[in-house]
Amino acid sequence: MIKITLKDGSVREYAVGTTVLEVAKSISQGLAREALAGKVNGKIVDLEYPLKEDAALELLTFNDEEGKTVYRHSTAHVLAQAVKRLFPDAKLAIGPAIQDGYYYDFDVEQPFTPAQLERIEEEMNKIIKEDIPFKRVELSREEALEHFKKQDEIYKIELITDLPEDAVISCYQQGDFDDLCAGPHVPSTGRLKSLKLMSIAGAYWRGSEKNKMLQRIYGTSFPKKAMLDEHLFRIEEAKRRDHRKLGQELDLFSIQEEGPGFPFFHPKGMVLRNELENFWRQEHKKRGYQEIRTPIILNRSMWEQSGHWAHYKDNMYFTKIDEADYAVKPMNCPGSILVYKTRMHSYRDLPLRWGELGLVHRHELSGALHGLMRVRCFTQDDAHIFMLPSQIKDEIIGVIDLFDYFYNTFGLNYHVELSTRPEKSMGSDEMWEVATNSLRDALEAKKMDYKVNEGDGAFYGPKIDFHLTDSLGRTWQCGTIQLDFQMPERFNLNYVGEDGQKHRPVMIHRVVFGSIERFIGILTEHFAGAFPVWLAPVQVKVLPITDRHHEYARELVKRLQGLDIRVELDARNEKINYKIREAQTQKIPYMLVIGDREMEQGAVAVRERGKGDVGAISVGDFIKKIEDDIQNKTI
């Protein structure tokens, strides 16, 4: 007998060779129906996997992220089988599960058409109804190569050739179809219920422009139709909220052919941007930060010393000045370090908290660019804290408190991940252990739930990542706290301690917004362009009904402008309903309609965004209301 420890901590005994599915059945038939795969000692396996020794077992359902991955990866195999049935000459490339769905890449003579996509989806549903079992078969390298050579699957042959010598090579069969795959998969195609093919796109084999362009079919799948319908609704809502679309409609920013990946901010977009930067400056000043500014271009020797030349060169832009090599900065931290080195510091000076709204440039492939979300130049709201080792915990807690205040101000929930040492890194094991434990201690002191993200730290230190959740339930990684023992060592940073001797400071790198451009994109989609009053590029639109109301309207505009309220006057000879509709389209928080009665009473008829007509009030009362909204940053 073997002992199996379940997720709830309970231990059950089973015969050697009992499968994961049999364990699920022994717990309940309902769980057996819901289970998609198992997780044995951290490894995800098929339900038919035999248990041969004591192990920890977690049964994965669609409620688990790993369960969703298995479900959608299996659907990708059904997609490949359907395409091969309908287009036998199609060559198979790869078909992974991705966030909210899956895709499969095919090499075909002609691009797929929308009509063909419908036929493929129909064929997939037939395959699901056939309830074909997924069967895992392990092959030697020679057997696998021979098998796929017979099928003339050139991409599978290339993948097999590139596998390590000791790799276990497996295929998954479903009827007369099979595919190279490590798995795992659901027991049979009948376990897959509701699916939808979403789109077709071109994709280079292995992501390289040097390789052939393939046809990529994107899809999604869910165990219930209601879940699929909800997902499709969210997608349509996301299209409506797309920051690229709203950025154009609201005249916030543009991306020009002359500068792909380099955003152009228009006057209204600059208002939004400046409000965010002002908020950032005010809150940092309250917490003892000082602002610095460092150059965009620095010489090669500095980037070699920082480690960026060795670890980050592929993402950097370069130039020459007087025949010497220079690079455009991809990060702000080396500049801050150089400022620190301009004078000797005492332990009494620390912690030093320096913030910088620094413009950085990073090379991105053209295919990866996406509005403000993925650009080649952006403003990083960096701050660097130089401190004593004894101050680490308190400083990290202070940064966490700042982040919490910022995100709550925008109505954004978040979850936290602790990212540990990546494969490509610098520094000793001991330094990494101390740094990682320091971050963990601060999170636990704040009683924060967090997930460990193994191997995703920066090359110079571990980090805490803050993932924001927007109004559509999507997550965005924005805030980061990185603890760094490496840079102070590489740049020979010192402070004079209480003992009169030189010591190494510890450094924190941190960003709240991450990228101001990207954060504007996130906020635009989160609020669907209907920004809170304090952020809105235009806060008030004054709408006189006829020409005789213009003078009163102009006086009102002048009064509001004197109070730093952002106001526009629509004095066009148009019907009032037309003016109202246009102001609504521009998502302006307040519309003030001026007619005879308002002139006589010294009042305004207020229309509030999302509420409509809320009645007439005195100008003084309206000013108090909007100033309260701005002061309190009402959402």
Curated annotation (Swiss-Prot):
Cited SMART domains: tRNA_SAD (SM00863)
UniProt GO molecular function: ATP binding; catalytic activity, acting on a protein; metal ion binding; threonine-tRNA ligase activity; transferase activity; tRNA binding
Region (Catalytic): 242-532
Gene3D superfamilies, per the entry: 3.10.20.30, 3.30.54.20, Anticodon-binding domain, Bira Bifunctional Protein, Domain 2, Threonyl-trna Synthetase, Chain A, domain 2
Location in the cell: Cytoplasm
GO annotation terms (biological process): threonyl-tRNA aminoacylation
Cofactor: Zn(2+)
Domain of life: Bacteria
Catalytic reaction annotation: tRNA(Thr) + L-threonine + ATP = L-threonyl-tRNA(Thr) + AMP + diphosphate + H(+)
Chief localisation class: cytoplasm
TGS domain location: 1-61
Family of the protein in this entry: Belongs to the class-II aminoacyl-tRNA synthetase family.
Name by which UniProt lists this protein: Threonine--tRNA ligase
Organism: Desulforamulus reducens (strain ATCC BAA-1160 / DSM 100696 / MI-1)
Upper lineage: Bacteria, Bacillati, Bacillota, Clostridia, Eubacteriales
Gene that this polypeptide is encoded by: thrS
